[in-house]
């Protein structure tokens, strides 16, 4: 921007007439406009009135001739606005910008954006005036700001100079547009179209957040971190101000209490997007279809940040009945299955969220079964977050449709869960046990027999891993074991030692599975964890001790005793090396107190 001296109207006129650019014999239209703007600094009210009349007349009559001159005029208005004190004169100067925007929207907005990154009260007042302008002007300005907002910023690009401006090709323009929109949204006098424009701005403000979290250098300096934090804060402010424009802002804000911090966090950004999308569907009925029309093109043609944000919106909005019915089912499931097979863990994680929302609308048993079977392979995913989400989604589906799921699907889920009941990863162990418990609770009494074998197979795993040093994991197994005891009707003998009671029940009531129980325990004697090996040895000893009360034939009892009593003691047995990673995952760190029987508190 050119540097202007602080001169009065007459001096400005003389200076202006000597400038080579304007050597015409008659004053140009631009020159007259600049002279009128400078005259607004006069303290004499008559001079101000004359300048106002002249300026408005020129802009209304000659604005078609100003193409290419708008940036210069905007610079002059901003320069003199900082010195204009008279409220009426300021109003005229700011009104001149609105008149320019009516005919030259793109040039006006672009010129103002170059002054908006380091925004002062003068620029703020100009944006507020544009937000309050008559509808055609206001809508044109908002549309142009949205167009700029859609661009990708780059913080490593050119920074604004001391005068607050930056070059035409600067990638900081989207950040300036964010600030301008924030000013307009905060002003209650500004009217915002609550339709597809509202949806578009929300989506691209959220995408701007994603850009900001990914556009810093690999080793940003302290100044870069501060600048990025400020830009993120400004974008969040704009988003909050826009959400408050809803008819029920308080209800929406209450539901979004936990999402604002998530949106500002690189690690949890997409969780925040999911919460925001759900809140929009719940509190702003009728916008869900508008969201889909904006999101779907980004799914197929957006850059990485746009696509991920669009995927989060897409999966969250599948919870809406109206939006689910608009799209064809095979299109939705096709997208989700493609994402589930993608090499990117985030894609797989989002696909599971989408499948969980699709399940809300399914009533057909076959469709539910196919969906659940499609989720089950995610239990073996390499990413922990994907595994946790798969278990959480299946839990919600089972709880919601417990009376509409085939029993064989229940059996398959519980069978696939068993290795994870004693997994070495505490979060996965807790999630697996929580799902296991809920599935047992949600099972119809008439269907219990079909699941009995799977419950029995889980008892040894749970019993031998009760003393995990991770207390939450250990507690989750104790809770699962209690549910198993209730399921099998083993609650009558609570006055007996729990370990002994369980072994007695297994021997008396399930003699045909004793070999299977002992084989399981024998596998655990190869665990790399000392206390798991100790527990396995003690379990075998306890089962063998109670064999006399078994309905088995004496020859079968003798065979079991001969086969399983020949193990060396724990002190004599070397610690084995287990080369198979799949087998190692079955074991977790367990900590047993070495006693003949475990106290009731452990069960």
Give residue spans per PLM region:
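HEAT-repeat alpha-solenoid elements in large eukaryotic scaffold proteins
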Residues: 6-16, 45-58, 85-89, 117-126, ...
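Intrinsically disordered, low-complexity regions enriched in proline, serine, glycine
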Residues: 49, 63, 67-68, 90, ...
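Alpha-helical repeat/alpha-solenoid scaffolds of the HEAT/ARM/MIF4G superfamily
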Residues: 182-279, 287, 292, 490-494
